[in-house]
């Protein structure tokens, strides 16, 4: 005797497909947020490295030109003391297009207000010390 077996169709139901799409959407939203945050942290670190380079170049310029505390300098004064392999050394601007300078010997370069505000969610004020 032959038993009756219902024909089972292969494939996924609409509900199963919608659940998978919802899970993928949630994972991509989380990943996108983390990528954007990591990018901003990298921008903050790069800006801080640029400020340190400028500070060293300003010190070299001041020693070579016999400048003392309180004397001012422009970016063009310290530019020859920077490595020319990065955008900051060529343009005199940070990643947000803000100009570096003028500088004062012994106080060094400062992070611009625009850059500080743009990166404040990943780099608090203590991060920028002594360049704030």
Where are these regions (language model features)?
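Conserved beta-strand->loop/alpha-helix structural units within folded catalytic cores of enzymes
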Residues: 29, 51-57
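Alpha-helical hydrophobic helix detector
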Residues: 18-34
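Aliphatic-rich helix starts adjacent to a transmembrane/signal segment
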Residues: 34-51
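Flexible coil/turn residues that form the inter-helical turn or adjacent wing/linker of helix-turn-helix
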Residues: 10, 28, 71
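Extracellular/periplasmic head regions of type IV pilus-like filament subunits
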Residues: 56-59, 63-132
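Conserved catalytic core of two-component sensor histidine kinases
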Residues: 21, 48, 55
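N-terminal leader/signal peptides at the extreme start of proteins
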Residues: 1-12
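Terminal, compositionally biased segments used for targeting/anchoring and flexible tails
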Residues: 25, 36, 41, 60-63
């Amino acid at each position: 005797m032959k038993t009756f077996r219902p024909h089972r169709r292969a494939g996924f139901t609409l509900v199963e497909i919608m659940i998978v799409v919802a899970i993928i959407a949630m994972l991509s939203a989380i990943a996108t947020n983390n990528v954007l945050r990591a990018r901003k942290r990298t921008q903050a670190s790069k800006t801080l490295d640029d400020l340190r380079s400028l500070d060293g170049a300003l010190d070299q310029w001041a020693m070579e030109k016999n400048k003392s505390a309180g004397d001012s300098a422009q970016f063009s004064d310290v530019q020859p003391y920077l490595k020319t392999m990065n955008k900051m050394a060529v343009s005199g601007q940070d990643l947000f297009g803000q100009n570096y300078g003028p500088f004062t010997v012994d106080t060094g370069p400062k992070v611009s207000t625009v850059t500080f505000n743009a990166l404040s969610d990943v780099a608090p004020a203590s991060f920028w010390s002594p360049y704030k």
